[in-house]
Amino acid sequence: MGMRMMFTVFLLIVLATTVVSFSTDDESDGSNEEPSADQTARSSMNRAPGCCNNPACVKHRCG
């Protein structure tokens, strides 16, 4: 492959990655805010007893 062909393939990969990144971001509402206290309380109520919300907790991970 020539340099021009390799550069074109590189640009196509970057473009495809960008399109995939933007399409998966549609699920969010665009805000980067922390969850409210009500949302945090509701999510912790739905967990079984003994579950750990901390990602570093390996012993009692649920979910």
Curated annotation (Swiss-Prot):
TM spans, by residue? Answer: none
Expression by tissue, per the entry, reads: Expressed by the venom duct.
Q: What is known of its domains?
A: The cysteine framework is I (CC-C-C). Alpha4/4 pattern.
GO CC annotation: extracellular region; host cell postsynaptic membrane
Q: Which residues form the propeptide?
A: 22-47
Listed as disulfide-bonded, the cysteine pairs are 51-57, 52-62
Q: Which GO terms describe its molecular function?
A: acetylcholine receptor inhibitor activity; ion channel regulator activity; toxin activity
Entry keyword annotation includes Disulfide bond: yes
Secretion signal, residue range per the UniProt entry = 1-21
Question: Keywords on this record?
Answer: Acetylcholine receptor inhibiting toxin, Amidation, Disulfide bond, Ion channel impairing toxin, Neurotoxin, Postsynaptic neurotoxin, Secreted, Signal, Toxin
Q: What does this protein do?
A: Alpha-conotoxins act on postsynaptic membranes, they bind to the nicotinic acetylcholine receptors (nAChR) and thus inhibit them.
Q: What else is known?
A: Negative results: does not inhibit high voltage-activated (HVA) calcium channel currents in rat DRG neurons (at 1 uM toxin).
**Where found in the cell?**
Secreted
Please classify the protein's predominant subcellular localization into one broad category: secreted
Cysteine amide modification sites?
Answer: 62
The biased composition feature labelled Polar residues covers 37-46
Would you identify the family this protein belongs to, as annotated?
A: Belongs to the conotoxin A superfamily.
Ranges of biased composition (kind: Acidic residues): 24-36
- Which residue stretches belong to region Disordered? 23-49
Q: What is this protein called?
A: Alpha-conotoxin-like Bu1.1
Q: Secreted among the record's keywords?
A: yes
